[in-house]
Structures are given as structure tokens and as C-alpha cells.
Amino acid sequence: MDVDRFESDLCSYLNAHAAGEFRDPNRISDRWSTGRSIGHISLLLATLASGAHYSDLEYPERSEASQRLARRSFQTLRLANFLFRPSLDTIQALLILGNTIQNNGQSDAAWALLGTTVRLAQTLGLHTIKSITHWPECIQSRAKALW
């Protein structure tokens, strides 16, 4: 993973969020609906949502922080058009989000999300060694860890 690029993507997302670019759910700029960077942001937000669930905050604040970050991660997944263009980042974010919503007591939603995540992973060919052999070694190891 290119940490400098990830940091740049994160700063771009935070600046866009602060500027209100994501307030209108019916209008998504091309900058966020295309490209891989938003998948990285979704993964980061999902990780933060999971981490917030286990933080030292008192229960009401901890739950609210976790849910707020999970909502933002789902929003960035939508911006990444994850159903039509899945990636390793979006698959990983979905797995983390499924665990997070399971921990928040939404087991039915987590079960449905897991089924969707598995189908998206199969779309990428993560279930077969043959389909990932042409990928770079660092990506292959990530794909194997996800499946």
C-alpha cells in the first residue's frame, strides 16, 4: 500500500466532507464516483468504526461513534459504486462493516451484508487461485487473506 497516496486521498476526502460535497445524496461528483481512492477511504472509515466499538468511551458515546463512522463508510462505498465495481478495498471494508454491525446487534443486516460481500468477492475471482495468478504478488497475498 502506498501510504503517501492513502494519506493524500484521506485528506482530500476530509476536505471535501468539510466543504459539504457529500450533503446531497442525489448528486455525486465524478471525482468521488470514479477512481480507487474512495475505496481506501471506505476501508479506513470501516476500520475506525470497528475500533470505536471497542474504545474506552462510555456506552452511548461509543455506540454512536461506531455507528456514525459506519454510516460514513457505507456512504463512501456508495460513492465508490461498490456493487458494480468491487475492489479488494471495498471487499475488506464490507467484511469489517459486517462485523461492526453484528457487534451493534444488527445480526440480520450483517448476515445479508455477508452474502453480498461473498458474491462480490466471487465476482473478483477471489475464490479461485487461477484468476489471481496474473496479479502482483503483494495483491495476491491480500486477495488470499480476504478469501
What feature does the model see in each segment?
Residues 1, 101-147:
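Acidic/serine-rich, low-complexity amphipathic helices located in mid- to C-terminal regulatory regions
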Residues 1-89, 96-106, 133-135:
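C-terminal transcriptional activation/regulatory domains of eukaryotic transcription factors
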